[in-house]
């Protein structure tokens, strides 16, 4: 019996560099100045209202137009300390750029994301006086568990206020989703770690890696040692398909596939000749597109509901299709097709809506595959933080500032109930929690970021 066609090195060596290069190359200075001049600099700007972090978009764009890169970066990073990453991965087409007045008038919004990236990257490339200087030490110690976007934002905000922060993470690197969970072409050039280096440069943040809550540390232990705890745990579990899933080469979780690509040279990552990705979100798109970029000949995304139910944005769907990915809706996984321990494909049941409920039509079909990637969502594992913390919808219940049911414990990011699983929203959670923790400790101050714009 022929083995599954699952292997690495499907492309010529030179192809990998181009395939996994920056998906959206940055603007040069001339392009940025021209694009900045398109902004109306609206008063009460709808783009700013649409941004979860309240980024003063007209202000930073006006500073770009004035060739004041430091001032533009100051405006961005004061609202969003992960402004460089968000410039790369935010779904701007459904947030700030959708709200742009130019979008209404001309169907072509100002390229806010690219301008934000231009300003932040430009500032990082220019050594000079730091935008943020740590406040006078308070003597208070805060544990931040999880070094993804929410945890990083919380740690930075707390350190800026003079608190000593220990930043715990289960992985070998800081960054969480930014380091392990995004397509390589979205964050090319090692930007995730460059941004983290900048965040840590404020001082007062001590990373502790390879340290997992529930295994190496406990919430009770942290509360005994620290004045407050922020949980930015993300979603550690992966949803199962709900069918028998034998252990087979090529049958794996999409998040693990994406993480492997982020931490390895692409030429050593194995991919099937024919790939099926089950799911309809951005993780599914990232896995499907990267499978094509690795040399897969046929990649099919399969989603159980109709096109309107896909959680991947229209932009992401079009991105997948332009890279040769087939998106097939109205089908649910029924069985793994295997023979002699070799993956051969997936059997699906065709579906439809009947009185608002998803039902099978009675039709079945098989999509041949050497590789099947599960991308049907992730779950919060409650056992890590313990049963004492209240949940809502399977995630941690909090108030608007991130305070949980436990005294001295805050939470934010994907582990927090009611969110949209957006990086920019996680940053806002961490930012607001830092303010709330500072206030709860009785140390809220009237300090403000230095807003004096100078040329970088």
Question: Which residues does each PLM region occupy?
Answer:
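Residue-level detector of alpha-helix initiation sites
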Residues: 81, 148-149, 173, 281-283, ...
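Beta1/beta-strand and adjacent pyrophosphate-binding region of the FAD-binding site
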Residues: 137-150, 271-281
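Conserved hydrophobic helix-helix packing surfaces used for dimerization/oligomerization
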Residues: 142-144, 165, 275, 299, ...
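Rossmann-like dinucleotide-binding cores of NAD(P)H-dependent redox enzymes
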Residues: 164-167, 171-201, 207-208, 288-335, ...
